[in-house]
């Protein structure tokens, strides 16, 4: 069994933490805010339903990034995209060459940003990987209750350095089986991430509705005209990918 640290305690972070705990791994779950742990602490664990069923015991919960990542063989960054730059700077000062960090999912350039911070800190980098989508399709359906609709198969993963992709896949296998596959390179994986295409236009073009809502009504925001904007952005993404080969 391995030691896995999850950075981010939202739906994806809790899904991974719960699943890995059920599989018998040592799990550390990090958040910048204690409030994210209140439900897990009060209930004594994480309840999983759907594609994974079970009640996982409470993992190590910490707001100290050093405590979370020190000695962990694998670190999963499951934080929102806007936090990747912050965590890249923090992790570059902490991670050691023998560790593996996976942005899951990343955004175009997440792994490159971490590599840049390693260079700025003049430190030898660890093995860095990113995916275009989360392995887990999941939602929080209540405090410390995660519904996993599916665990995806054949999710492309790319690494820095590129030549280490097979090593990363082998190191992730004890945790996630063979669900990750070689994604060629980080540019290909980054351009395969459709989150910005599908999520940003509905939110921006419905900004008043979003501001007035207690909870983001993401799946009710797409009108026929907004769908045209999404399609236009996606065509641009695909054209860029084709031009870059």
PLM region descriptions:
Residues 1-50:
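NAD(P)+-binding Rossmann beta1-loop-alpha1 motif at the extreme N-terminus of oxidoreductases
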Residues 2, 126, 153-155:
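Nucleotide donor/acceptor-binding cores
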Residues 24, 58-59, 72, 98:
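Short, well-ordered alpha-helix to beta-strand connector turns
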Residues 54-71:
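Short acidic low-complexity segments
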Residues 76-77, 81-144:
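Rossmann-like NAD(P)(H) cofactor-binding subdomain of soluble oxidoreductases
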Residues 153-245:
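Active-site-lining helix/loop region of Rossmann-like oxidoreductase modules
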């Amino acid at each position: 069994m391995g030691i896995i640290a999850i950075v981010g305690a939202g739906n994806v972070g809790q899904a991974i933490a719960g699943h890995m705990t059920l599989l018998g791994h040592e799990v550390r779950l990090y958040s910048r805010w204690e409030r994210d742990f209140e439900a897990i602490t009060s209930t004594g664990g994480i309840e999983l339903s759907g594609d994974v069923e079970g009640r996982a015991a409470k993992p190590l919960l910490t707001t100290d990034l050093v405590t979370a990542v020190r000695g962990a063989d694998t670190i999963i960054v499951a934080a929102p995209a806007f936090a990747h730059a912050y965590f890249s700077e923090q992790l570059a000062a902490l991670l050691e060459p023998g560790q593996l960090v996976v942005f899951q999912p990343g955004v175009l350039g997440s792994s490159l940003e971490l590599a840049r911070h390693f260079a700025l800190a003049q430190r030898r980098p660890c093995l860095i990987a990113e995916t275009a989508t989360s392995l887990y399709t999941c939602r929080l359906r209540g405090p410390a209750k995660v519904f996993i609709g599916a665990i995806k198969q054949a999710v492309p993963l790319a690494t820095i350095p590129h030549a280490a992709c097979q090593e990363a896949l082998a190191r992730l296998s004890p945790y996630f089986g063979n669900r990750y596959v070689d994604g060629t390179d980080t540019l290909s994986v980054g351009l395969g991430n459709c989150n910005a295409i599908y999520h940003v236009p509905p939110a921006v073009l419905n900004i008043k509705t979003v501001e007035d809502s207690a909870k983001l009504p993401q799946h009710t925001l797409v009108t026929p005209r907004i769908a045209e904007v999404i399609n236009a952005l996606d065509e641009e993404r695909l054209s860029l990918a084709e031009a870059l080969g």
